[in-house]
Amino acid sequence: MSAFLLRKNIFTKGKGEQMKAFLILEDGTVFTGTSIGSTRDMISEIVFNTSMTGYLEVLTDPSYAGQAVVMTYPLIGNYGITPDMESLKAWPDGYIVRELSRMPSNFRCEGTIQDFLKKYDIPGIAGVDTRALTKILREKGTMNGMITTNENYDLDEVISKLKNYKVEGVVSKVTCEEKYVLEGTGKKVALLDLGAKKNIAKSLNDRGCEVTVYPADTTADEIIASNPDGIMLSNGPGDPKECTTIIEEIRKLYESDVPIFAICLGHQLMALA
């Protein structure tokens, strides 16, 4: 009985109920839930992730910069926050879950998702039917949405804001500021950081490769001048079509005889080049 009471109490805020929150889509659909993380208003592109584990890796993946992530798996946060981060911070604009575990159990746990979201000022909402939401996104396509705790929102005004919202320039926000090298004794790989998860460079380095990580605005001439054995274009956020300068540099990389391979955004940019 005491364990049940403890679980019940941690879902409340003081003596009152948890703060109500709303997720509003640009087609006018509204989901009601409870606020987790920051309580500020948030507008972003809404996307979904179907992973059953690895929610911390999702939260710290730079590919989600400029997006609010819907987790389709129904229970999130049951092992808390661990050191398994893909970058130095959290990137999504917002976080949407069905149920948030507030009693994580893990010997490596260093905190809760609730505290993690607050630390990085990320608004979130729990109590949403995330699978129904995902079906909407799947059938109607990705759309913008707002998370708000304001119960007196004007729906028409919100929809107008959502339809005019556009994500721009996110690659420049997530790339490294200057190049750095992971020493190795094997092949030399040039990694163009478009928002790379740390495990990409680590996995190459673990296999003996010397990995030089370059900022996204690095020229093809500089990369080729380093005489790499291979070039890798990383994952990253945003619309690939807006990365016109990077696409032009990739075209120049094609003119070299160096093998090129890519992940996620990098692969899309290769196709556009």
Predicted regions and their residues:
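Short, Lys/Arg-enriched N-terminal segments with co-localized hydrophobic residues
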Residues: 3-18
